[in-house]
UniProtKB/Swiss-Prot annotation:
Cell compartments where the protein resides: Cytoplasm
Composition bias type Basic and acidic residues, residue spans: 173-184
Name of protein: Eukaryotic translation initiation factor 3 subunit D
Highest classification ranks of the organism: Eukaryota, Fungi, Dikarya, Ascomycota, Pezizomycotina
Organism: Chaetomium globosum (strain ATCC 6205 / CBS 148.51 / DSM 1962 / NBRC 6347 / NRRL 1970)
Sequence segments annotated as region (Disordered): 118-184, 563-584
Region of interest (RNA gate), residue spans: 312-326
Keywords: Cytoplasm, Initiation factor, Protein biosynthesis, RNA-binding
Principal subcellular localisation of the protein: cytoplasm
Domain notes: The RNA gate region regulates mRNA cap recognition to prevent promiscuous mRNA-binding before assembly of eif3d into the full eukaryotic translation initiation factor 3 (eIF-3) complex.
Family statement: Belongs to the eIF-3 subunit D family.
Any one GO cellular component localisation term in the record: cytosol
Single Gene Ontology MF annotation: mRNA cap binding
Xref: PANTHER family: EUKARYOTIC TRANSLATION INITIATION FACTOR 3 SUBUNIT 7, EUKARYOTIC TRANSLATION INITIATION FACTOR 3 SUBUNIT D
Amino acid sequence: MAEYTAGTSPLVDLINSLPDSDGTWGPPITNETTLNGVPYAPFSKSDKLGRMADWTDAKDGRDGRGRQQYNRNYRDQQVYGAGSASLFAPPAAEDEASFSVVSNVRDTGKTRFGRGAIFTRGRGQRGRGGQDTRGGGRQQFQRGGRGGQQYGGGGYSDRGGGRGGGARGRRFGWKDYDKPQRNRDASVNIRPDWKLLEEIDYNRLSKLNLDTDEGEDVDSYGFLYYYDRSYDKPPVKSAERKLAVVDRAVYNVTTSSDPIIQELAEKDEATIFATDSILSMLMCAPRSMYPWDIIIVRQGNKVFLDKRDNAALDMVTVNENAADAPLEASEGSKDVINQPGALAEEATYINHNFVNQVVLESSNQKVDMANENPFHSASEETEPPASKAYKYRRFDLSTSEETPTYLVVRTELDAVQKNPTSGEDQFVTVHALNEFDSKAQGSGGALDWRTKLVSQRGAVVATEMKNNSCKLARWTVQSILAKADVMKLGFVSRVTPKANDKHVILGCVGWKPKDFANQMNLQLSNGWGIVRTIADMCLQREEGKYVLVKDPNKNILRLYEVPANGLDDDDEGPEPEGVAEEED
């Protein structure tokens, strides 16, 4: 065996070459890994901190709720200091370890909305045009029996379902795939021979702008009763005022059937003619969600904005703009009174009677306009006319002095009241908001009016502005067009949430129309720009008939050119199932 000496042994040389460790074991401590003598591990503030260990989970790390739950619990679970290598290594182009995609797409519910049929077909309208030029569309609202009003699916049909996600978004739950989605039907049947001319989305409409003057009065007709100021006071619980049925003759005559507009057109007073109901729908189009249609007739150099009988825009919608709008009740459900069609008919009925109830009918105290009601015939009517004044007003929509363009619109006023300061007469428009059930689906998070209307009136009105943006905007535009001094909004609720045939009046609040428009961020210049744009589209084409249709499921307006007989009775849509007709 070979013998090694101390001076020549390789092992001894290796040991002697090691640094002095001062009695410690292991590699020496360098300054690079100490901070004031305290060892530390390099780390970055951007490192994500997670659980070091979770002894409560199953060994496979999954809780049985699927991949989505697994990703949410274990995404980016990094241990302390795991990112220290990034201090010395060059940064990667894309760090996919901490990158995740979260979908922010809202689950948009699609509602199936159908025709705009008015109540029942008993004592109907007095025929538009043709035989009686002064006739036209007086609407009779009829009541049902013990079961309340006989509502069909005529107003707005909504067969959709599902637990609509609203603004919060949601995950699909058990059998969500098996629940019907909301798809609305168009308000008018689109025929194959209709020619699509224009397609305008809401973004383009919102950018239009046209400044106009406040308009001038051309002529006035009808009369007005004085408003009953006692409805402005909060009712006492023991003496609540119930909504009464007031039978008065009310007329809803379209533009081309109005004898006064026909006379003004013959005198060449304007280029565009419309009624306040049709014009307000067009001016507030970017706020609308439900389908509607407007008939546009060009004769020579004139444009008439018309509507069909019992059109969708005649109905008073309920919570149209709510995040979770009312749904069509499922088959066999008992909640049929809270479906969109029933709510629209109920709201229309309430508005018809409310405006007639809040006036003081007295032949000695009323304000007569320059002319009598052009639609009422005392020899033919059995009911007295309602308090209504029709003011025909003209607006200048010219964009240059070379080609003047004027619009004549028939506006309506509902009552008159004395100014408490000056004692002068103020013109009033009256409308009613209705509460059906604050806890039901489709209520839009509305407060209980009976307990909150007096103490939190601002919150109640703000909620209604959100849920009924289109309806309130239309009422405000109509008040401004008529140059009304005050716009009265009544608050009407059901006596019991489960019955829609009895209502109680909770109060009435008045606003100046322009102030209310500012609160709603309503710009009339945008509305006038929409009207002028649509009119120019028709004036640039040949004479004929056109139909402007709101897409039932998209924020788009479509302009169609239709043949002369392209809007027959067949285009009114199929008769809703289950509509009960009543005879007087």
